[in-house]
């Protein structure tokens, strides 16, 4: 199965203002945590063209949460998400965010799921307790 490199953390740190405005239009819940930065480009034959991402609210809002990988994940938007690195348009923002340790890169199989179980967020095998 193919793997991709994803940024995991508060997506507000790595997206442009316009992209973040698009993200904020979604009303995320544990059953529907996926969105698209360019929904007008969505196609079942080229799913990645729409630049998909996944995002979930933290149970306790902003702060710093520790992942099962022992790393800290900082939050300023009350949410943690993941997006494939090749879907991030502003690589400079990504580099700055990684340098500051606000979020981290992870390799996931494209089929790895993510979800929320009462504040326990998971991305593949990575778990982040936010409750």
Put a short name on every predicted segment.
Residues 1-131:
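Intrinsically disordered, low-complexity acidic regions enriched in Pro/Ser/Thr
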């Amino acid at each position: 199965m193919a793997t991709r490199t994803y940024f995991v953390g508060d997506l507000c740190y790595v997206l442009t203002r316009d992209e973040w405005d698009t993200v904020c239009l979604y009303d995320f819940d544990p059953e529907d945590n996926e969105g698209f930065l360019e929904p007008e480009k969505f196609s079942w034959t080229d799913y990645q063209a729409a630049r998909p991402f996944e995002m979930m609210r933290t149970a306790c809002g902003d702060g710093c949460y520790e992942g099962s990988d022992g790393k800290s994940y900082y939050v300023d938007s009350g949410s943690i998400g993941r997006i494939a690195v090749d879907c991030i348009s502003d690589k400079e923002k990504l580099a700055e965010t990684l340098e500051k340790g606000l979020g981290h890169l992870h390799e996931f199989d494209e089929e790895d799921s993510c979800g929320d179980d009462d504040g326990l967020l998971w991305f593949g095998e990575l778990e982040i307790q936010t409750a």
